[in-house]
């Protein structure tokens, strides 16, 4: 009996160390950033079982077998659709401004199409204005409405949007609604899904959270896009979820959420439509390619239009493109670079690009919320402040609520707006979308919004920052070490 017990004990110990060695080897063999690999190894060596379970659950990008197969299967038809779109040569920009040209060329090479011109674009900063405009557009819709959001929170004006969407479905408009399972948990627990389906709306719960499948797909891989397309001609995107800020997270202690949305008319809606169709097929297996490009591209006035490129990220889309786009934008800056984000946990490369821009004389400003709804990200963000301040970067802490806007402005001409936070999840994990806009007029509008944010912010004093308590420095470094995992 003692011999059997001893043998079992040795086998258990051997299996334990083989498991640790196997996971270690797997981490080392994966092509990943060194800080991320080191952070995972530290967790596994300090808390082996917890670390191994955590790594297998969220350490690698698992879309899931079924979704991965759909992603592979959809590309032949998607590629053909993109080739057909290229035949509509009159919608594509042939040249760009000097500051935007490198970024637009990068996107064209990696995504297969150039930026589209002739779009009308309106910047919107008030949630009431966004929802009222959206309700009007829904009421005037004639063919189809496609919507995807990370969060849909019932209450306030969000319910009015839901009512207008159901009314559209009842009068024969084809309506599709895709919402992230984790972000929209309150919606899926409410009566709204059943009401919408009964009205004729196709409602899809994207990336369902299922603990039974935690090792088959990453549970923290989320559908983070916010997009609305109407009749393949009107489109919305930006940082705003389908929530009424007056009712959303009022007990979080961070104030009202501050967002930015763009409303567009023109061929950009078709370019966004193909992104939506890919997401829909990955999630449902159903192919819903937009109408042939030569049918739905409307006449436009080229001289008064904006040139826009859509940048999509996530499994099945060009890897690392949004990260490359941000690096390209930072290195293209010659006069000034302004960035706004609620969550700032940049990669080493992006941090270096931002600091280098400041060190070569570019006026660099970063606007962050003073209070954050994520304690982990809030502390991790602070760990980068010393290096940024030393390089000459101006850090503004917004005091008018939770600044949720994600925007970048380069030299007043190249603008990036969308759903992408400057953190690891947005850069390498989630389904995201960013618009790259090459236009001085839009740049002036975005600059005015950013100036308003700055007027409601406090400039971080480098001298006072260096005098902060020791315990804060220790906490910052602790969270900094785990920043590659956030």
UniProtKB/Swiss-Prot annotation:
It comes from the Bacteria. It is found in: Cell inner membrane. Signal peptide: none annotated. GO terms for molecular function: cardiolipin synthase activity. Gene3D superfamilies: Endonuclease Chain A. Its EC number is 2.7.8.-. Its main location: membrane. InterPro entries: Cardiolipin_synthase (IPR022924), CL_synthase_A (IPR030840), CLS_N (IPR027379), PLD-like_dom (IPR025202), PLipase_D/transphosphatidylase (IPR001736). It holds the Pfam family PLDc_2. It catalyses: 2 a 1,2-diacyl-sn-glycero-3-phospho-(1'-sn-glycerol) = a cardiolipin + glycerol. It is a multi-pass membrane protein. NCBIfam families: bac_cardiolipin. PANTHER family: CARDIOLIPIN SYNTHASE, PHOSPHOLIPASE D. Belongs to the phospholipase D family. Cardiolipin synthase subfamily. ClsA sub-subfamily. This is Cardiolipin synthase A.
């Amino acid at each position: 009996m003692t011999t059997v017990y001893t043998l079992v004990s040795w086998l258990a110990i051997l299996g334990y160390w083989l498991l640790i060695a196997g996971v270690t080897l797997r981490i080392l063999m994966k092509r990943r950033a060194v800080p991320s690999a080191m952070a995972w190894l530290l967790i596994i060596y300090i808390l082996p079982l917890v670390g191994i379970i955590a790594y297998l659950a969220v350490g690698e990008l698992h879309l899931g077998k079924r979704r991965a197969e759909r992603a592979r299967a959809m590309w032949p038809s998607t590629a053909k659709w993109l080739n057909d779109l290229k035949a509509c040569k009159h919608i594509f920009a042939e040249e760009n401004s000097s500051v935007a040209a490198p970024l637009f060329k990068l996107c064209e090479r990696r995504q297969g199409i150039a930026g589209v011109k002739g779009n009308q674009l309106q910047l919107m900063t008030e949630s009431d204005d966004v929802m009222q405009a959206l309700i009007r557009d829904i009421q005037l819709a004639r063919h189809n409405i496609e919507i995807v959001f990370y969060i849909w929170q019932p209450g306030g004006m969000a319910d009015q949007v839901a009512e207008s969407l159901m009314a559209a479905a009842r009068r024969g408009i084809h309506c599709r609604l895709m919402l992230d399972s984790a972000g929209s948990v309150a919606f899926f627990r409410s009566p709204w899904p059943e009401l919408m389906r009964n009205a004729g709306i196709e409602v899809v719960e994207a990336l369902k959270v299922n603990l039974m499948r935690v090792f088959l797909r990453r549970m923290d891989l989320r559908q983070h896009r916010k997009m609305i397309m109407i009749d393949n001609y009107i489109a919305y995107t930006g940082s705003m979820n389908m929530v009424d800020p007056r009712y959303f997270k009022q007990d979080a202690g961070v104030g009202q959420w501050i967002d930015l949305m763009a409303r567009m008319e023109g061929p950009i809606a078709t370019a966004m439509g193909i992104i939506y169709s890919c997401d829909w097929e990955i999630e449902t297996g159903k192919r819903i390619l937009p109408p042939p490009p030569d049918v739905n591209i409307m006449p436009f006035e080229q001289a008064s239009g904006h040139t826009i490129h859509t940048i999509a990220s996530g499994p099945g889309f060009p890897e690392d493109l949004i990260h490359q786009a941000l690096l390209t934008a930072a290195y293209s800056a010659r006069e000034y670079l302004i960035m706004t984000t609620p969550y700032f946990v940049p990669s080493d490369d992006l941090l270096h690009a931002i600091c280098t821009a400041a060190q070569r004389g570019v006026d660099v400003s970063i606007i962050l919320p003073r209070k954050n709804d994520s304690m982990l990200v809030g502390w991790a963000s602070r760990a980068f402040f010393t290096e940024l301040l030393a390089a000459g970067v101006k850090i503004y802490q917004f005091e008018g609520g939770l600044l949720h806007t994600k925007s970048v402005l380069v030299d007043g001409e190249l603008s990036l707006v969308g759903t992408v936070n400057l953190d690891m999840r947005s850069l390498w994990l989630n389904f995201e979308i960013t618009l790259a806009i090459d236009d001085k007029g839009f740049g002036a509008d975005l600059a005015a919004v950013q100036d308003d944010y700055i007027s409601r912010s406090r400039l971080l004093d480098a001298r006072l920052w260096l005098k902060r308590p020791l315990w804060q420095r220790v906490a910052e470094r602790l969270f900094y070490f785990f920043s590659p995992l956030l």
